[in-house]
């Protein structure tokens, strides 16, 4: 990923996804915001761009189903992941103070994740859902009685005043983003005997028989493969029969290396339906927003 490339991401600009795309592709010749996750996948699949950046999981809200479903039904693979600690900032146009605010705008998820703070400090404020946190930030520029719950990138780029920073009800809010491409990543370098720094995401359908799921999980256990995440997904929305489920799994290791390679061979031998969604370097920890809001306009 060293040569200049064009990269698509779930827009609009100045969102958390935009910040992640900038961090991962600082060399990109162009970052292209697209309106939906489906559109990002289409752009990569059709060769318009080599990479796309989309959210896949939030530590509070859970899985982003549109991303997972697109990976299951499409041809793209995960090539990289990035975790971002989410920071919700209450901001308004310059010279607006908390006493002026009569309504607060943001994406519905952000409003819900800041509910306790809003109940305590703005119980009478009208809470207005917006299409995105970045759009909310733009909308308050023309409204002297409005504040937005917005990401730091939007606050900085739009020159908003910070009314209060870090207003989320929980301080462990993080979102996991993935880079999707036509190929996943090769195995990462490591010292002999060192654990793999890679992660593999896959989906499987267990044999439709008594103990089928237990048998599949037993294959991973027998191969000493650690599963870091497992989630069921109804097949009915994926052109499958009603009341049957696929299981989306994150496993330590790379699909081309032992012991995960042997586990995948074992699943194939037992007749389990398996699709690898990608092997890629594991994100070691959530990364806080790189932006410094100390230069943003303070407000009382």
Question: Which sequence ranges carry the predicted segments?
Answer:
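Domain-level signature for soluble enzymes in the chorismate/prephenate branch of the shikimate pathway
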Residues: 1-300
């Amino acid at each position: 990923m060293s040569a200049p490339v064009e990269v698509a991401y779930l827009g609009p600009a100045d969102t958390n996804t935009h910040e992640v795309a900038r961090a991962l592709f600082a060399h990109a010749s162009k970052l292209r915001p697209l309106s939906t996750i489906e559109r990002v996948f289409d752009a990569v699949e059709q060769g318009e761009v080599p990479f796309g950046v989309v959210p896949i999981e939030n530590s509070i809200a859970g899985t982003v189903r549109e991303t997972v479903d697109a990976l299951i039904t499409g041809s793209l693979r995960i090539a990289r992941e990035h975790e971002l600690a989410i920071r919700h900032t209450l901001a308004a146009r310059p010279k607006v103070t908390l006493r002026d605010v009569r309504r607060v705008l943001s994406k519905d998820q952000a409003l819900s994740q800041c509910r306790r703070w809003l109940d305590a400090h703005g119980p009478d404020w009208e809470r207005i859902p917006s299409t995105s946190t970045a759009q909310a930030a733009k909308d308050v520029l023309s409204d002297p009685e409005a504040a937005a719950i917005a990401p730091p990138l939007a606050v900085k780029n739009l020159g908003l005043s910070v009314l209060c920073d870090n207003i989320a009800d929980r301080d462990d809010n993080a979102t996991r983003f993935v880079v999707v491409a036509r190929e996943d990543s090769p195995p990462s370098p490591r010292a002999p005997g060192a654990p793999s720094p890679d992660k593999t995401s896959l989906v499987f359908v267990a044999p439709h028989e008594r103990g089928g799921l237990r048998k599949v999980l037993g294959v991973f256990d027998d191969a000493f493969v650690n599963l870091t995440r497992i989630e069921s997904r109804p097949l009915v929305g994926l052109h499958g029969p009603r009341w049957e489920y696929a299981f989306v799994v994150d496993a330590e290791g790379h699909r081309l290396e032992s012991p995960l390679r042997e586990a995948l061979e074992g699943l194939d031998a037992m007749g389990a339906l398996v699709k690898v969604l990608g092997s890629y370097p594991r994100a070691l920890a959530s990364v806080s927003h790189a932006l410094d809001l100390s230069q943003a306009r303070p407000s009382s």
